[in-house]
Design a protein with these regions (language model features):
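Divalent-metal-activated hydrolytic enzyme cores
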Residues: 2-29, 54-55, 64-84, 96-199
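Short glycine-enriched loops at secondary-structure junctions
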Residues: 38-44, 63-66, 92-95
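Catalytic core of membrane glycerolipid acyltransferases/transacylases, capturing the structured
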Residues: 43-60
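Conserved functional hotspot residues or short segments at active or partner-binding sites
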Residues: 89
Length: 199
């Protein structure tokens, strides 16, 4: 995947596996290499930024890569039925969901007061699921004196991974058994490159 991203970021994308023969060969089934949970942002399509083709990636996209039951079910399906060996949780630079959650936190102090970072899957009390999850990541970052938007985006990826692992016994077991590796990443709109995150 990173080789494909290098091609994309250098303007040398090959657009593989997008021909008629590939499409017809996938009619009876799929065997993607990885599952990717990423933001719905129209500037961040995983298949394009990783220069992948039809059948290569099983993608789930939500605003701010937030997690709900449908997301967990989709990733569990990818593990159990499609046997993917890699899960990628990818945030990105200049994320609108992060900006929206930050604006909400700055406008309403009671949102901060509703949050405890003692639980890795704790959320803020808000009607907006984006504010509940992404806002919690922002406050977690701030509690560690990480105060830039870049920090918030990286911490949100880390908390999203923690949330997935804590809430899905299927994902837990697959990681423990060595069947799946889960990786955090962040796409840089300014360069077209994907950075792999370490936590």
């Amino acid at each position: 995947m990173l080789a494909g991203n290098r091609r994309f970021s250098q303007g040398e994308a090959e657009h593989p596996w997008q021909d008629r023969e590939t499409r017809e060969g996938l009619i009876d089934g799929q065997s993607p290499d990885a599952a990717v949970l990423s933001c719905s942002d129209s500037r961040v399509p995983p298949e394009i930024i990783f220069d992948e083709g039809l059948g290569d990636l099983f993608t789930i996209r939500t605003a701010g890569e937030i997690v709900d039951d449908a997301v967990k079910a989709s990733l569990e399906f990818a593990i159990e039925s499609l046997h993917v060996s890699l899960l990628v949780v990818m945030g990105h630079e200049h994320c609108g969901a992060v900006q929206s959650a930050l604006s909400a936190l700055n406008a309403d102090e009671s949102l901060r007061e509703s949050f405890s970072d003692a639980d890795e899957s704790a959320e803020i009390e808000s009607d907006s699921i984006v504010v509940r999850q992404v806002g919690a990541s922002i406050l977690t970052a701030q509690s560690s004196e990480l105060n830039t938007t870049d920090d918030y985006e990286r911490v949100h990826v880390a908390r999203t991974i923690e949330h997935l692992v804590a809430d899905s016994s299927i994902i837990q077991s697959a990681i423990a058994d060595g069947r799946v590796t889960i990786v955090g990443a962040r796409y840089l709109l300014t360069t077209g490159k994907v950075e792999v995150l370490s936590f």
